[in-house]
A protein has these predicted regions:
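Phosphate-handling catalytic cores of nucleic-acid transaction enzymes
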Residues: 1-376
Length: 376
């Protein structure tokens, strides 16, 4: 299934989530309820694992038989190797794979390096094309959409170390974050996830399984646009500019979660709208709590590097008094800036009083012309 995002692009609903919390804080509490949700997939996987084991045993006995083509195993073990990952991705035939890792180090081992691991995270979030080319006759050559749902956990120190080189490359913005606060060291009370719980959950799971095609929810689309603008304004007022670049994908994560709830319940509710607002704020709060200092330092280093070369003081100075968004996009391209940041830049300039919206585009304000009179 697919949804249409704020930028007009249609894509899928992969979930990449990382819980960052101290040791012994209860990060493993998701295991029991998620096992209930995945129960049907586990049963199918067990059948196919048995068939694969039988094929391997026959090969060891010298039988010349081809590997069965329909051996989809969707739930991968945390010690999965790179070769096994590529094989399972090829076997899945378009179905989503699921991985649950108790520590990020497992992702590094599977990928072969931190750089490769972060690349997988980025591609998985975007449901982008992934693959490898191999020359061996028995090696897997695959190139397909990377459909992967990943849930992992780690400690704050390990997370900061793992993503130290990926602060500004788009990896962090693509990860849904959570944490566990327990300052009073209260002993957790765990739920009971038995057959009764499975029966209560079954209608929601069935609705999700039956969803397909392009999913539309006008209420969610309208709500997320308002939440994005509100978050950007709030960060500007609070002096948290270092988080501004994280608003867009944090809103995508909140939107995906809301759509999943919408599909599971079969209707749009006030509770889902409230959850969407909370999720966006929570993503930014955890990002700042865990990676805030790291992000600030990376931004300062990037700004220091930019000051070493001539820069345009204000991108609007090159534009006519009235222009359209496409005009600014072309200017962004000419000065080497990312076109994807145009919408955010325009919203910021309107918020700062430098631009006003017109019927067909934007117009510079008198305030802007007075402030930058010597540059226009």
């Amino acid at each position: 299934m697919r949804v249409r995002y704020e930028n007009g692009v249609e894509n899928e609903l992969p979930i990449i989530h990382l819980c960052v919390a101290p040791q012994g804080s209860g990060k493993s509490s998701i295991i029991a309820p998620s096992d209930v949700i995945l129960r049907d997939i586990v049963c199918k996987d067990n059948e196919n694992r048995s068939r694969e084991a039988a094929w391997k045993a026959a090969k060891r006995m010298g039988e010349m038989i081809d590997r069965p083509q329909d051996l989809a195993v969707q739930i991968l073990s945390s010690d999965c190797t790179a070769a096994a990952f590529n094989q399972k991705l090829a076997d899945a035939s378009g179905k989503y794979l699921y991985m649950r890792m108790d520590e990020l180090e497992g992702l590094k081992k599977m990928a072969g390096s931190v750089d490769r691991a972060t690349e997988i995270l980025r591609l998985a979030f975007d449901a982008a094309t992934y693959g490898q080319e191999r020359v061996g006759a028995d090696s897997v050559t695959t190139r397909c959409t990377l459909r992967l749902n990943l849930v992992a956990s780690t400690t704050p120190v390990t997370a900061q170390k793992f993503f130290k080189g990926s602060t500004l490359d788009g990896t962090l913005t693509r990860i849904g974050l959570s944490t566990i606060n327990n300052p009073d060291n209260v002993r957790w009370k765990y739920g009971t996830y038995d057959l009764r719980y499975a029966d209560e959950l079954a209608p929601y799971v069935e609705r999700l399984k039956s969803a397909n095609g392009l999913i539309t929810c006008p209420q969610a689309e309208e709500h997320i646009r308002a939440l994005m603008e509100s978050a950007e304004d709030r960060l500007a007022v609070n002096g948290q500019d270092h988080l501004a670049a994280y608003v867009y994908r944090a809103s995508i994560i909140a939107y995906r979660e809301a759509i999943i709830l919408y599909l599971a319940t079969g209707k749009w509710t006030r509770e889902i709208a409230d959850y969407m607002a909370w999720s966006l704020d929570y993503q930014l709060w955890v990002m700042d709590k865990v990676f805030g200092r790291q992000i600030r330092l990376a931004h300062e280093e990037a700004q220091a590097a930019e000051r070493m070369v001539p820069v345009v003081q204000n991108l609007l100075t090159a534009m006519p008094d009235e222009f359209m968004a496409d005009d600014l996009k072309r200017h962004f391209i000419s000065v080497g800036k990312k076109v994807t940041s145009v919408s955010s830049y325009l919203r910021q300039q309107v918020h700062r009083g430098n631009l006003t919206r017109t019927l067909h585009g934007y117009s510079k304000t008198e305030r802007f012309r007075q402030r930058y009179e010597g540059m226009v």
